[in-house]
Amino acid sequence: MANITAQMVKELREKTGAGMMDCKKALVETEGDMEKAIDYLREKGIAKAAKKSDRVASEGMTHVISNEKHAVVLEVNAETDFVAKNDNFQQLVDALAKQILEVRPDSLEDALKTEMPNGQTVQDYITEAITKIGENISLRRFEVKEKADNSAFGEYIHMNGRIGVLTLLEGTTDTTVAKDVAMHIAAINPKYISREDVSTEEVEHEKEVLTQQALNEGKPANIVEKMVEGRLKKYLSEISLEDQPFVKNPDITVGEYVKQSGGKVVSFVRFEVGEGIEKKEDNFVEEVMSQVKK
């Protein structure tokens, strides 16, 4: 059995950042081989990271970056808001955005398999970050957009990455207009670009609801149709970007504002951290008891 010295433990701690007892155990298990001990700790770290993966990651941040031809918006999740504000986490998000912008994978599964500049796969890069940061982290989603020459990307990040928006305008290269539209989308959260994009099924469903509302209000049948028509028009304008009053100048619509620059909104992506994720609510008593039993 190798003689494990305090200096060896100290050196391993400095190289890995692991705890003293973990380092000592790693050296004992690998008979004092420093490189094997590092591998041992990495393997244990990965095992720990895998164990953390059943925890809900509903915090995090969005990020938007672009180059001359392409842009990406993505969401990376963590478990707590505290970690989301951590410099290491923010650097990770930026690195993932740059990787996706460079490689432009077709799917999340493909993205996780791509190779980072340091030779690691994206999945391994994230797993290593989980070990260092101590929380479950996941690349949740991303979208990549491509633009032509006479087009503009608009990028807007709200509340330190809580909301990220990417817009694509055609017919103009005015990035200020594109960014203004992105800011509007962050604030108002439209569902569609124009009312023409709303499906017939959704329109008919809303019409049925509004008709029933009007009838329940006791309105005469002869004016119900006109009421429904007016309310439906209002509903469509509320969910359609081009029809919405522009946040920076409510006297004009977003469509009118964009048209002033000769442009047209052709797409937008709005990511809000954690939307659609059900947060796990632990029972406080159970949480305390689980800590006592450890």
From Swiss-Prot:
InterPro entries, A to Z: EF-Ts_dimer_sf, Transl_elong_EFTs/EF1B, Transl_elong_EFTs/EF1B_dimer, Transl_elong_Ts_CS, UBA-like_sf
Taxon lineage: Bacteria, Bacillati, Bacillota, Bacilli, Bacillales
Primary residence: cytoplasm
Species of provenance: Listeria innocua serovar 6a (strain ATCC BAA-680 / CLIP 11262)
Entry's localization field: Cytoplasm
Any one of the GO CC terms: cytoplasm
Protein's job: Associates with the EF-Tu.GDP complex and induces the exchange of GDP to GTP. It remains bound to the aminoacyl-tRNA.EF-Tu.GTP complex up to the GTP hydrolysis stage on the ribosome.
GO molecular function, one term: translation elongation factor activity
Segments for region (Involved in Mg(2+) ion dislocation from EF-Tu): 80-83
UniProt xrefs under HAMAP family: EF_Ts
Record key words, sorted: Cytoplasm, Elongation factor, Protein biosynthesis
CDD domains: UBA_EF-Ts
Signal peptide: none
Protein family membership: Belongs to the EF-Ts family.
Family matches, as Gene3D superfamilies: 1.10.286.20, DNA helicase RuvA subunit, C-terminal domain (1.10.8.10), Elongation factor Ts, dimerisation domain (3.30.479.20)
Gene name per UniProt: tsf
Protein name as annotated: Elongation factor Ts
